[in-house]
Amino acid sequence: MKIIAGLGNPGQKYDKTKHNTGFMTMDHYLDKKGLTLNKDKFEGHWTKEKINGEDVIFLEPQTYMNESGRSVSQIANFFKVAPEDVLIIQDDMDMPIGKIRIRANGKSGGHNGIKSIIRDLGTEKFNRLKIGIRHPKNATVVSWVLTPFNDEQQKLMDDAFDTSVDIIDDFIAGRDSQYLMNKYN
């Protein structure tokens, strides 16, 4: 069994903001596959599907970004999913807009959602699909991450969302993190 979790903040106010890149990526994947998050439990919206013979849980925590670990750990513990079988989709301010990087483990890089997941899973050994949102040039971090992408930026993000569909499919198919990093980084 696998868990794919997209990080973001709940509520329409945050819907299309940069910090909701994880939610937007997840929504893009689910739309492409004709799936919906139809359950509310574990402090998140989620669904469990069978894809190519593999049980997969898709999750969008509803705890706000900084407490995402509560939702991820609750569902992982309930379904007894090992951290190595978890893929977290997150935004990354240290990468250019739309740039993708796969990581198999590691520190949070200052991302509070990832800090929370490391704390609540008790390990850094879970997979991340990081999508760049760039560091703000002339804005505070908070105002940057809580604003939508402009049209030019959105085109780059749309390409990243399309590539993410392939990455998620490869993860579900059992491709290991080294394969994913070699192919997509």
Curated annotation (Swiss-Prot):
Class in the EC hierarchy, top level: hydrolase
GO cellular component terms given for this protein: cytoplasm
Positions bearing the site annotation: Stabilizes the basic form of H active site to accept a proton: D91
One GO process term, biological-process aspect: rescue of stalled ribosome
Binding site for tRNA: Y14, Y64, N66, N112
Record localization: Cytoplasm
HAMAP family per UniProt: Pept_tRNA_hydro_bact
Function: Hydrolyzes ribosome-free peptidyl-tRNAs (with 1 or more amino acids incorporated), which drop off the ribosome during protein synthesis, or as a result of ribosome stalling. Catalyzes the release of premature peptidyl moieties from peptidyl-tRNA molecules trapped in stalled 50S ribosomal subunits, and thus maintains levels of free tRNAs and 50S ribosomes.
Protein name per the record: Peptidyl-tRNA hydrolase
